[in-house]
Design a protein with these regions (language model features):
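N-terminal auxiliary segments of SAM/dcSAM-dependent transferases
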Residues: 71-104
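C-terminal alpha-helical "lid/dimerization" subdomain adjacent to the S-adenosyl-L-methionine
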Residues: 98, 247-305, 311
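Conserved alpha-helix/loop element of class I SAM-dependent methyltransferases that forms part
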Residues: 113-116, 122-144, 158
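Hydrophobic beta-strand segment of the Class I
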Residues: 114, 215-216
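Class I SAM-dependent methyltransferase SAM/SAH-binding core
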Residues: 144-205
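Helix-to-beta-strand junctions that scaffold the AdoMet/dcAdoMet cofactor pocket
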Residues: 164, 224-225, 238-239
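A short glycine-rich, Lys/Arg-flanked "PGG" loop and its adjoining helix->strand segment in the class I
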Residues: 228-243
Length: 334
């Protein structure tokens, strides 16, 4: 049972952040002539939208797996060309080329019991936070929403109700196991006609420019290798005036909460071992939270990607935070 929380007990006031601008060159995607067979599902996007290239559309209940001319790195495609180029995988420093594969292994391992562990680790509060994040999009009937790192579909369930029959939610995740869990969950709830599933790299998005009214990413950004690149990709595919909403673990705003939270999170790997039989994956998740940028740093990154009106809302005294940014509307020419 989910504990009851009022908005006031979870969040603090919005904090204004000075905007900084910045854009990147778009990474062009070309669908392969003979893509791998779709592993999972796409709903009836072929009748509802033109965001996915026709050559990549599949039948009802299949996931679109979209690749680019520079293939997504996986644990089958590791490159060690630049051993000096490293990034963090939890506390470990690993070659950049290895991180995507390591993260993939984590989520393949935990996918089946991911939702159960979310409830255990957050004491159910993740559901309240996701509802708040979905509300922050201001999504309405007819909107097209991209849910990045959408995994097991919690955000899609909420957003699909907001956009209605004339809108569409695109659940995009690089991990097929997580998408499979999300597909099954939504099917069990009878959500079929306005959700599409795309297996693709969030750092190289396969959608046309200015496709979406809003983009969400809930508890997924910290797993990206190049967060700045991912944010620039989001800027590229969101419409002018569109909202970016990021829900992520963050830095508690007082020492007492920080120490209590660290103590609680230390037992997550042990709980993970009991519930899923996998301790190491949850050790990574704990470490990835500690290595994630704090509220101000992430706000600056969002601004540097080009978003304006950047702000964040602390939840549970900063244990998590919702960041928002808006893509500026084009100024009318004289």
């Amino acid at each position: 049972m989910i504990p009851a929380f009022s908005a006031g007990s979870i969040c603090s006031s919005w904090e204004k952040i000075t905007n900084k601008t910045g854009r990147s060159t778009w990474l062009n995607w070309t669908p392969p002539e003979n893509p791998d067979p779709p592993s999972l599902l796409l709903s009836e996007a072929e009748q509802k939208t033109d965001l996915i290239p026709s050559s990549q559309k599949t039948s009802l209940l299949k996931i679109d797996r979209i690749q680019c001319t520079s293939p997504i790195e996986s644990h089958h495609q590791l490159s060690m060309d630049k051993e000096d180029d490293v990034t963090h995988f939890g506390y470990q420093k690993v070659p950049i080329s290895e991180k995507a594969g390591k993260v993939a292994q984590v989520f393949h391992s935990v996918a089946e019991r991911y939702d159960i562990m979310n409830d255990v680790m957050s004491l159910g509060t993740h559901r309240v936070m996701k509802k708040m994040a979905a509300n922050a999009t201001h999504a309405r009937a007819g909107h097209h929403i991209l849910d990045l790192a959408g995994g097991t579909g919690d955000m899609a369930i909420l957003l699909s109700e907001y956009v209605g029959a004339d809108g569409r939610v695109y659940v995009c995740d690089i991990n097929g196991s997580m998408l499979s869990q999300g597909r099954d969950k939504l099917l069990n709830r009878g959500i079929l006609t306005n959700v599409s599933y795309v297996q693709a790299d969030g750092e190289k998005l396969p959608f046309p420019d200015e496709s979406f009214n809003a983009i969400t990413i809930a508890f997924g950004l910290r797993n990206f290798t190049a967060k700045e690149s991912a944010l620039r990709e989001m800027y590229k595919v969101i419409k002018p005036g569109g909202k970016l909403v990021i829900l992520e673990f963050s830095t508690p705003d007082n020492t007492l909460v920080q120490n209590a939270y660290k103590g609680f999170s230390k037992i997550w790997p042990k709980i993970g071992k009991l519930v899923t039989g996998d301790e190491s994956s949850y050790q990574y998740l704990v470490e990835s939270i500690e290595m994630h940028p704090d509220q101000q740093t992430l706000s600056d990154m969002i601004g540097n990607a080009g978003f304006g009106r950047v702000r964040y809302q602390n939840l549970l005294n900063g244990i998590a935070a919702i960041h928002q940014g808006t893509k500026p509307r084009l100024e009318p020419t004289a």
